[in-house]
C-alpha cells in the first residue's frame, strides 16, 4: 500500500486557499507519503562524503571573481583554456598582440608619394594651374553697334564705345522723366540728415 502511494502526488507550487487550511492539514500525511522518491544519483551522492564530490567549473565560476585569473575561466560558456592561455592572460592581451603581428609598413603611401623635396619638381604629381575659361557669348547687333569688345574678345555691355554715341544714333527718343529730389535728401552724411530742418529754415 505504501509503495502504491509513492509518486502519485507532487508539489506543484499551489498550497490552496486560506479557507481550505484545515483540509490541507488533514491531507499533509498523505502528501508526505505520496511524494515521489528522489533520483538514485542524488541518493548515492548523499551517502558519499562531501570531500569526494566533484563540482564543475561552472559551479565554481563565482568562487574566484576577485582573483587575477578571473578572465581565464569560462563564465557562462565553455572555452578552450589552452587557446585562451596562448591568446591573452592578465599580462598578455590578445588585441595588442594581434596588432603587433599584423602591423603594416611604418611608412604610409602618402609619405612615399609626397616626400619633402627642394621644389614642386620632386613631386610625382605636378600641380596644374587653374585656367579660367570664359563661356562663349552670342554676338548681337546691339553689342556690335554700341559695345566694345572685352579682354577675352567677347562683346560686353559694360563699356560704351565713344565712336557711336547714343544721342546721335537715336536723337528722337524722349528722356526719361525723373522726379526732382528735395534739398533735404541731398546730404553727404548721416549727421547732415539729422539737421535737414535747419537747412530748410535757412533757405526760407
From Swiss-Prot:
Principal subcellular localization: other
Entries under InterPro entries matching the protein: HDNR (IPR029369)
Keyword annotations from UniProtKB, A to Z: Cell projection
Pfam families, per database record: HDNR
This protein's GO CC annotations: cilium
UniProt-annotated location(s): Cell projection, Cilium
Protein name from the UniProt record: Ciliary microtubule inner protein 7
